[in-house]
Curated annotation (Swiss-Prot):
Cofactor: Ni cation
Pfam families the UniProt entry points to: Amidohydro_1, Urease_alpha
Protein name: Urease subunit alpha
Active-site residues (renumbered): 324 (proton donor)
Record-linked NCBIfam families: PRK13206.1, PRK13207.1, urease_alph
GO biological process: urea catabolic process
PTM annotation: Carboxylation allows a single lysine to coordinate two nickel ions.
Oligomer and partners: Heterotrimer of UreA (gamma), UreB (beta) and UreC (alpha) subunits. Three heterotrimers associate to form the active enzyme.
């Protein structure tokens, strides 16, 4: 017998369904449910008197192999692939299927492989948003505490380099040399994150590069502080082509060894991930943004300039002096710093992100960027652009779904593709590692409710451990069992080069994390960036710093007020 429910009542019990709209935090961004894979009347719901009981939603007789390990019920999935509602099935640490879970003997439309049995755990996803774990592809490994800060924000993968608070690491994302790479892989083996380390690529002769890749480096970093000259760029890219690894780039701010055209010429059309394709982070001054118009360049920017606000310029000078070991008493150092901080190009960076011309947002952790704010700054940028530029022409219906999908891709699937990791992570799709983040809509982008790492809860909002229920104050993000002991190795990946895997030398490190080789890092480019593949000719006036893309002047005002800020946090 059918039963009709009021929409508000249905949403309260099972979460939003097709046509319902959800505001993301206190932003102006509205997500609308595009489709619903659950079956009306047969929804999964756990609790006293609810559906997931024996011989109802839970199928008796289902073996451990047949049943899911865990099911997230009635989740609103926000991913580059769409904005939709579904159950998410997890098996052996991976997303087994997305659709309708339950007992196929008594329920309609149960998706194959989504049986709920006596061996199945449940996470109530109704009323929550689920996104893929974030991928931060610009990490300075300055201190291990970054990992926990990032995980608490919803980031589950680090790509970058460093050896701790060494002067070189404070400025550059390089783990130089085979010994450092081995030691850092061992040191980060206890962090509940997927890890990929980049070696140092600044050399005009290839000796020394092979040893780093053999030790497990997933890429090589070219940084101006080590000398990013055209010969070094050419040498590093030539080596990377042979090894199928990514090259990350921070170009020459001072234009001592050449200008932006010289760096572009040194690329010779080869794939490169250009860090700081932005308004103030470094690289050829003042026109590094031109690099965003090259088809072989995967451009990214970092969160200190995300988005452009009335405080951005003042904050940057002090940060820059510290991060790059500069001296206020040396005029040339001050001139170097000031040349990198330009309001006009920072404003253009906002718009280039909104156009999909800059493909990735990352942190630049403790080296001008904040490791725990990648996700927050991304959504603040999206809100600012929605507020200043209005709806995107690609939008359909009374929602911001396309813009939402574009921005979530910047810190999930696109960095995963750029670094050859998208076969494992980066999206909410079957077969991927179950790195998933649950958010209450009102806290979206600021504070996750649960962070699931490889199918097990690693971090979560939790109340007083001595309380009689989980929710009494103080209620804040705390480490959970997925971040402890041997579970870390079972639920996380150490990404390494294919050479390290093939030669087998990496196994002598006895890492507890599963090893996975990066793949298809070469022969890709802007066109491979999901929803962020806009290619326009970009010019920067050397006198006024005005930026034009496709002939259009890119100009916007700095924000005075942002969402996801002091309404949620004391500091």
């Amino acid at each position: 017998m059918s039963h009709t429910m009021q929409r508000r009542h249905y949403v309260d019990i099972y979460g939003p369904t097709v046509g319902d709209r959800v505001r993301l935090g206190d932003t102006g961004l509205i997500a609308e449910v595009e489709r619903d894979h659950t079956s009306y009347g047969d929804e999964c719901k756990f609790g006293g008197g609810k559906v997931l009981r024996d011989r109802m939603g839970q199928m008796p007789g289902a073996s451990n192999d047949e049943a899911l390990d865990c099911v997230i019920t009635n989740a609103l999935i926000v991913d580059w692939t769409g904005v939709y509602k579904a159950d998410i099935g997890i098996k052996r640490g991976r997303i087994a299927a997305i659709g309708k879970a339950g007992n196929p003997r008594v329920m309609a439309g149960v998706t194959p492989g989504m049986i709920v049995g006596v061996t199945t755990e449940v996470i109530a996803g109704e009323g929550h948003i689920v996104t893929a774990g974030g991928v931060d592809a610009h990490i300075h490994f300055i201190c291990p505490q970054q990992g926990y800060e990032a995980l608490a924000s919803g980031v589950t993968t680090f790509v970058g380099g460093g050896t701790g608070p060494a002067t070189g690491t404070n400025a550059t994302t390089c783990t130089p040399g085979a010994r450092h790479i081995s030691l850092m892989l061992q040191a980060t083996d206890v962090l509940p994150l997927n890890i990929g380390l980049t070696g140092k690529g600044n050399t005009s002769s290839p000796e020394g590069l092979l040893e780093q890749v053999r030790a497990g480096a997933v890429g090589l970093k070219l940084h101006e502080d080590w000398g990013t000259t055209p010969p070094a760029i050419d040498c590093c890219l030539s080596f990377a082509e042979h090894e199928d690894i990514q090259v990350t780039l921070h170009t020459d701010t001072l234009n001592e060894s050449g200008y932006v055209d010289d760096s572009i010429a040194a690329f010779k059309g080869r794939t490169i991930h250009s860090y700081h394709s932005e308004g103030a982070g470094g690289g050829h001054a003042p026109d590094i943004l031109r690099i965003c118009g090259e088809p072989n360049v995967i451009p990214s920017s970092t969160n200190p300039t995300r988005p452009y606000t009335v405080n951005t310029l003042d904050e940057h000078l002090d940060m820059l002096m510290v991060c790059h070991h500069l001296d206020r008493n040396i005029p040339e150092d001050v001139a170097f710093a000031e040349s990198r901080i330009r309001g006009e190009t920072i404003a253009a960076e906002d718009i280039l992100h909104d156009l999909g011309a800059i493909s990735i947002i990352s942190s630049d952790s403790q080296a001008m960027g904040r490791v725990g704010e990648v996700i927050t700054r991304t959504w603040q940028t999206a809100h600012k652009m929605r507020d200043q530029r209005g709806r995107l022409p690609e939008e359909q219906g009374d929602n911001d779904n396309f813009r939402i999908r574009r921005y979530v891709a910047k810190y999930t699937i696109n960095p995963a593709i750029a670094h050859g990791m998208s076969h494992e992570i980066g999206s909410v799709e079957p077969g991927k590692l179950a790195d998933l983040v649950l958010w209450r809509p009102q806290m979206f982008g600021v504070r996750p409710e649960l962070v699931i790492k490889g199918g097990l809860i690693a971090w979560a909002q939790m109340g007083d451990p001595n309380a009689s229920i989980p929710t009494p104050q103080p209620y804040y993000m705390r480490p959970m069992f997925g971040s402890l002991g041997a579970a870390v190795g079972e639920t996380s990946i150490a990404f390494v080069s294919s050479r390290a895997m093939d030669e087998g030398s990496i196994r002598r490190l006895d890492l507890k994390k599963r090893l996975s080789a990066v793949r298809r890092c070469r022969k890709i480019g802007k066109a491979d960036m999901r929803l962020n593949n806009t290619l326009l000719p970009i010019t920067v006036d050397p006198e006024t710093y005005e930026v034009r893309a496709g002939g259009e002047l890119l100009r916007c005002d700095p924000a005075k007020i942002l969402p996801l800020a002091q309404r949620y946090s004391l500091f």
